[in-house]
Amino acid sequence: MKNEKNEMPFWEHIEELRKHLIHSVCAMIIATIILMNNKNVIFDYILFGPAKTDFITYRLFHKLGKIFHRSHHSFYFFSHNLEIQNRQIFGQFNIYVWTCFIGGFILSFPYIFYEFWKFIKPALSDEERKYSRGIIMMVTFLFILGVLFGYFILCPFLIHFGYTFRISSFPRNIFDLSDYISLIMHSILSMGITFLFPIFIYFLTKIELISYPFLKKYRKHAFLILLILASAITPGDIFSTIVVLIPLMILYQFSIYISFYVSKKK
């Protein structure tokens, strides 16, 4: 049996949606203000972390490089901090506002999804609600996992590749502030959304736009695409490619299991 909220007139649905949107925007504004009041922590310790030689990922892979008999100067190690420059009068202020705004969205994303779920939940049947239990926790977990993967794995690889790639020994690589911050924020947000792939598969299977046999049949093709994607976003050696590829393959395989579970319950 569906909730009587389904019988609400159209404009009452719009009013209900407006309420959830206001709550989401308020949460995002609060998160943005919190980030703005912690500028030093956000920029010096978090966003500029991958630009420093002592970043945890570089230290970890430097040690792994020694274990696997690489040279003393590990492929994942910088000899000095990266040079980042700002060339616009209001560049730092614009970056400050834009970064805190995007960061506010990332920080409040679980709550925003919660508000979205509260809006659509009354339209679900009791059986659909039963199989959707824990969806908020799962979305939050996968999104945070993707954000961490983007920050600690993807960002260092991309930055290292951009810093070490040379067309000639003549030009120096000095990063532009806006390009650097955009790379960090884009990597974090895109990986957070990418890790929600199993959730998308769940709903696509529920509405029968995709099926378990289809995902299983084209698994090898999907893995090949993931391999190409991982190779494109990593420096080029096999080890870094595998590090990025494995989580993507696990996500796809997990999505197959989810599709099978949903299909079986129908």
Swiss-Prot record:
Q: How is this protein positioned relative to the membrane?
A: Multi-pass membrane protein
Any single GO molecular-function term of the entry would be: proton motive force dependent protein transmembrane transporter activity
Q: Transmembrane residues, as ranges?
A: 28-48, 93-113, 134-154, 183-203, 221-241, 242-262
Q: Which GO terms describe its cellular component?
A: TAT protein transport complex
The record ties this protein, via InterPro entries, to: TatC
* Statement: the UniProt record of this protein carries the keyword Acetylation: no
Where does it localize?
Cell inner membrane
Q: Which family does it belong to?
A: Belongs to the TatC family.
Q: What does this protein do?
A: Part of the twin-arginine translocation (Tat) system that transports large folded proteins containing a characteristic twin-arginine motif in their signal peptide across membranes.
What is the name listed in the Swiss-Prot or TrEMBL entry for this protein? Sec-independent protein translocase protein TatC
Its taxonomic path starts at:
Bacteria, Pseudomonadati, Bacteroidota, Flavobacteriia, Flavobacteriales
